[in-house]
Amino acid sequence: MNDTVTIRTRKFMTNRLLQRKQMVIDVLHPGKATVPKTEIREKLAKMYKTTPDVIFVFGFRTHFGGGKTTGFGMIYDSLDYAKKNEPKHRLARHGLYEKKKTSRKQRKERKNRMKKVRGTAKANVGAGKKK
């Protein structure tokens, strides 16, 4: 599958403020299925001489008729900057962020406690009970 897949970048921009390089990625894959994001990350890592863990690709859309897919990619200078600037859902896709999930019962109890008070007191109730 790797032999006829071409990756091109355009609208390349170095964003010094967020310590990253950002670009539009065109993937040419005639007669083949859409290329997995992991494979795109690995190929970009080779192109830009970095590791795949600091590369974030998203928003890929395959053009009508297939053969060409376009998306967006960002290469951070380090993993720390990526964790600081990337949205949590994108970090979760890489396994860098785990959302803490409260139980359904706890969420319902909190909601019902919040309904009983009005105004600024909601902040105290929402924080939870002090022990």
From Swiss-Prot:
Q: Where is the composition biased (Basic and acidic residues)?
A: 90-100
Protein keywords: Acetylation, Cytoplasm, Isopeptide bond, Nucleus, Phosphoprotein, Ribonucleoprotein, Ribosomal protein, Ubl conjugation
Q: Which PROSITE patterns has this protein been placed in?
A: RIBOSOMAL_S24E (PS00529)
Q: Which InterPro entries match?
A: eRP_eS24_sf, Ribosomal_eS24, Ribosomal_eS24_CS, Ribosomal_uL23/eL15/eS24_sf
User: Ranges of Basic residues compositional bias?
Assistant: 101-119
Name the Gene Ontology molecular function terms of this record. structural constituent of ribosome
- Main localization is cytoplasm
Crosslink (Glycyl lysine isopeptide (Lys-Gly) (interchain with G-Cter in SUMO2)) position: K37
Question: Its domain of life?
Answer: Eukaryota
The cellular component terms of Gene Ontology attached to this UniProt record, alphabetical and capped at eight, are: cytoplasm; nucleolus; ribosomal subunit; small-subunit processome
Q: Which residues carry this modification: N-acetylmethionine?
A: M1
The UniProt subunit note reads as follows: Component of the small ribosomal subunit. Part of the small subunit (SSU) processome, composed of more than 70 proteins and the RNA chaperone small nucleolar RNA (snoRNA) U3.
Give the protein's function. Component of the small ribosomal subunit. The ribosome is a large ribonucleoprotein complex responsible for the synthesis of proteins in the cell. Required for processing of pre-rRNA and maturation of 40S ribosomal subunits. Part of the small subunit (SSU) processome, first precursor of the small eukaryotic ribosomal subunit.
What PANTHER family does UniProt report for this protein, alphabetically? 40S RIBOSOMAL PROTEIN S24
Q: Which family does it belong to?
A: Belongs to the eukaryotic ribosomal protein eS24 family.
Designated name of the protein: Small ribosomal subunit protein eS24
The source organism is Bos taurus
**Which gene underlies this protein?**
RPS24
